[in-house]
Amino acid sequence: NKIILGLVVYQGIRTEELARLELQDLQLREGKINIQGSKKTEGRLLKLEAHQVYDLMDYVNVIRKQILEATGKQSNKVFTSIGTSLNFSNIMQNLVSSLRENNVKLRDIKQIRTSVITNWLKIHNLRKTQYMAGHRYVSSTEAYQINNIEELQEDIKKYHPIG
């Protein structure tokens, strides 16, 4: 859960991309992760945080092997469930359920990704954010700027002395 959540928070990876992630997509020595493109998204090579590299190494070399041995599964996918199901959505449903225990307002993983991209737009330029988010079209990234503008308008209404 910690690794999956970290990939969503630090790299803005979508659920579908997490489900498709295979061992050869991890470049742990270089501290990078390769996200394969799809019909909707562009592929991209993203930097991992230092703690993510260690966590992923531990997961791939120890925990994942234990899960595969215990369940008798064979898979090239990075993430696999502990149960008999091969369905990745079960993993994500469990993650969202456990996150909701701490934050009741959380709707889904997309909500976290939206916050991540909105934050990236505050830090990076539009094109870099587009690349990092894997958006094929810049208009997809620009939609998050509108999201940010709406937040600013709400703040103005809330805190402006005349408003």
PLM regions and their residue ranges:
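Active-site/catalytic core of tyrosine-dependent DNA strand-transfer enzymes
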Residues: 49-104
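DNA/chromatin major-groove-contacting recognition/catalytic segments
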Residues: 47-50, 131, 146-163
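Short, polar N-cap/turn motifs at the start of nucleic acid-interacting alpha helices
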Residues: 26-28, 105-106, 125-144, 150
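Conserved tyrosine-mediated DNA breakage-rejoining catalytic core shared by Y-recombinases
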Residues: 11, 15, 20-55
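The alpha-helix within a helix-turn-helix
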Residues: 8, 19, 130
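Short, basic (Lys/Arg/His-rich) helix/loop patches that form interaction surfaces
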Residues: 93-131
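Basic, Lys/Arg- and aromatic-enriched nucleic-acid-binding interface segment
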Residues: 1-15
